[in-house]
Amino acid sequence: MPKILKLAFGAILALVVPALPAEPVPIGNPDKFSEEIVEIISQKRPRDAADLIANTVGKPDASDSLQKFLQIFEDKNFDFTKKVIDKDYNGAVRQIVYYSYLKGFGFVYFRFNFKMTSTGWILAHFSFKDETNELFPKDFTDR
């Protein structure tokens, strides 16, 4: 399982590396957006998920790097997926976490952090991490 930790770090790094300036795309419904991303990943479509995430955060150049990290899920069977956290902080910031069990792989969490702007919600951060023993990965959620 340590491999996924390296991949999760790389996925985070891919999204914070400076790229050509682009504006984040406002998201009308963070709940629907998060659900869609997890669904795309579970359908073994890492390219589509990477493109959507990278374009939404305003870093289209990060798509190829992110796809490489998401490919770990390409041959995995998503046995169970459910939203486990949806925390809204006074309509200004919001965190959504999905939990998935992947047969033969283990437990994976997908985290989406959204922030409100004058134009609407933006995806400020996306990451994923595995955890076997605890309910949530350490330092992964704001609880």
Language-model regions: role of each:
Residues P24-V25, D31-E35, R47-Q95, G106:
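Short solvent-exposed beta->alpha transition segments
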Residues D88-R143:
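Exposed beta-sheet edge and beta->alpha loop/turn motif
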Residues K3, P21-G28:
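Short helix/turn-capping signatures at newly exposed starts of structured segments
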Residues A11-A14:
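Short, linear, compositionally biased motifs with a strong N-terminal bias
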